[in-house]
Amino acid sequence: MSEADVRLAAEVIQARAAGRHLLLLTDFDGTLCEFHTDPAAVWLAPSRRALLEEIASDPRATLAIVSGRRLEDVRRRTMLGPDTYFAGLHGLEIEGGGDRFRHPAFDRSEALLRSLAEPIASDLAALDGTFLENKGPSLVAHFRAASVEDGARAEAVLLRHARPHLDASALRTMRGAFMLELMPNIEWHKGCAVNWIRDHVVKQYGDAWPLYIGDDLTDEDGFRAVRGDGLSVAASPRAGDADFAVDGPREVESLLRVVTRQLTKSGEVR
């Protein structure tokens, strides 16, 4: 067992010994799954799905997937059941535990971003290794497969088309790994999604001990949301605001095995 495994095991044991309900929140791309130049090619590995299903079905735990993808997209790619919470578009849409949330900005921003999608996509088509992903309430310029120069040009394309709306504070940008996202200018992010889910889990179980795992800049808000009352793990060498870091999805899978073992060893069900 690695040092990271040992530390997580100790934290889980301590939380369970205090009789707390485990709330596992995890990102998808780069955390549960390896990155791919084509987002449509990413699916959850069966071995990792089995571990997550074991956690989700345990009455001592609740599982939540917090992703920048559309909610239905990440649900389809994980193939996890109704016991799991899903937060899509960095929390603009959330479902789970019989509850649903859709931020008012979700519908307001779609028409504006739709008008920008075609000209941005047309300009990106001239840059090798770049493409535009239209999520509805957000647009993402991807450049993982591009040269450094074309990646910078892709960012410039997005910013040029969006500039009037950025200056008017109607839209904002969010950076991630080899991507730049254009989205509604609202104070809502993965940390807000974590708080929303935690509040609903607390209503059901009376308590929740949050464990957040993520790999990207967009996960920093999630790390901060659990600070002081939970544990955060960066699935990349860059720990950022996380409590500690592991090296990618393979080590995340190892951590999930630790969690399932500790749940099996834990005491009374809450």
Could you say what each language-model-derived stretch is?
Residues 43-135:
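Active-site phosphate-binding/coordination module
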Residues 2-6, 19, 193-270:
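Mg2+-dependent phosphoryl-transfer enzymes with acidic/Ser/Thr/Gly-rich catalytic loops
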Residues 22-24, 84, 210:
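The start of beta-strands in P-loop NTPase/AAA+ ATPase cores
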